[in-house]
Amino acid sequence: MVGSAFRRIYPDAESPTTEEFHNGLYDAKGKHIVHLAAKVGGVKVNTEEVGEFFRMNSIINQKLLHMAHHSEATKVVSLLSTCVYPDAPYITYPLTENQLHLGPPHPSNFGYAYAKRMVDVMSRAYRQQYGCNFITAIPNNLYGENDNF
């Protein structure tokens, strides 16, 4: 939903080819990147294609952060999803960021959720090793136009 809302605001924004993506990031010196890219789907496809959701989203995340690091982008904000949080009994409400890695995510989003968790881990690792200003944010659940459940 965040991505489709972004496209409504910026209708000329489109998914670039790998080469355009690569060249665009290398030219992004001094710019901020908001990472919204992801393979997404409803519960049915998420449970049927668990490995594919993990693989594709892991590739997207790894390429983007690696290229952003080498482009010397000044900041990357990667959006996660509330599905990254584990279920009870691992958490208490209200949810806090320190509960993110306390247990497995719900099986209905397993591959997607773990890939999103890994972008958080990777952002922390790049920040620790290279001093990159890479952070993650978890927007609250939304309901509305373009929701797919």
Regions found by a protein language model. Give the residues of each.
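SDR active-site strand-loop-helix element
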Residues: 33-39, 76-82, 137-139
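Active-site helix of classical SDR
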Residues: 111, 115-118
